[in-house]
A protein has these predicted regions:
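Active-site metal-binding loops of divalent metal-dependent hydrolases
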Residues: 10-12, 40-43, 68, 92-94, ...
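Active-site metal-binding motif and surrounding structural segment of the metallo-beta-lactamase
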Residues: 45-95, 206-213
């Protein structure tokens, strides 16, 4: 099956004039006979960017929320207002309270900015599961990703409370898997579960060894140098053809990946399209 993945929301924009950037991520996954929206950004740029790129989101069959952070879910309400009710695939824990606490000095609420009841009232039809599942032809959600590597430790600045006492392990983090003739394509939100952990689960669950591409946020912009080193080693071992970094991959980690994988790494800014 063929897919076209277009980045609609990202921290940065590409060469297409008139598009807007914001801290967040959203990608439109188009396939024969339909389309799926993966994440929704913060809410300011999804609809304007889709319009600028001539993408009609009214025809989107469903929405996947990769996890319960504002910069991936904030555009859901504007989408529902503009395009009508949608089925929303998510982990049942996405509405948990979430905070970012940096240096024990400042606490920011970073959870979904709407309640579940409010979104249901706006037309969201939530389809919750924590399991690996098929949501369309050759399209799968990882569900909860087991943390098996020793070096992917998660973001130490994320908590379930304002005081920063209860770490948030982001168990709701999930990614989208597309099975293509070229191999697996992984669409990532933030990949809080770890890029290598997610790749290993994808291979195990689908039975496909070959990873053609990964696209989206990898959270490598928030990891230690040691974790980045180990991730580079693992990616090289998997022989991935395209590494398309967005959002929380960050500038420094993107520069490292571009150096380590010349011709294979691509900055996936707003407007970037991957066809497989």
């Amino acid at each position: 099956m063929k897919f076209r993945i277009t980045v609609l929301c990202d921290n940065s924009v590409g060469p297409l004039s008139g598009t807007l950037g914001e801290h967040g991520f959203a990608a439109l996954v188009e396939y024969e006979g339909g389309a799926l929206l993966f994440d929704t950004g913060q809410g300011k740029t999804l609809l304007p960017n889709a319009q600028r790129m001539n993408r009609d989101l009214r025809g989107v069959a469903g929405v996947v929320l990769s996890h319960g952070h504002y910069d991936h879910s904030g555009g859901l309400w504007p989408l529902l207002q503009s395009c009508g009710g949608k089925e929303v695939y998510a982990h049942p824990g996405i509405f948990a309270r979430r905070y970012a606490v940096r240096n024990r000095e400042r606490s920011l609420s970073i959870g979904i900015p709407y309640t579940e009841d409010f979104l249901r009232g706006q037309g969201a039809r939530f389809n919750f599961s924590e399991e690996f599942r098929e949501i369309g032809t050759e399209m799968f959600l990882t569900g909860e990703v087991p943390r098996v590597t020793s070096f992917e430790r998660g973001d130490s600045g994320l908590f379930c409370d304002e005081a920063g006492c209860s770490p948030d392990f982001m168990i709701d983090d999930q990614s989208l898997l597309l099975c293509t003739s070229r191999g697996l394509v992984l669409v990532l939100g933030c990949c809080h579960a770890g890029l290598v952990n997610t790749i290993e689960l994808a291979r195990e669950k689908t039975g496909q060894e070959k990873i053609h591409a990964v696209i989206g946020g990898s959270h490598l912009g928030f990891c230690s140098p040691a974790q980045l080193d180990e991730t580079v080693k693992a990616l090289r071992g998997h022989g991935i053809r395209k590494i398309c970094g967005s959002h929380c991959t960050g500038f420094a980690a993107s520069a490292r990946l571009a150096q380590e994988f010349p011709g294979q790494f691509h900055p996936a800014h707003v407007g970037y399209t991957l066809e497989v």
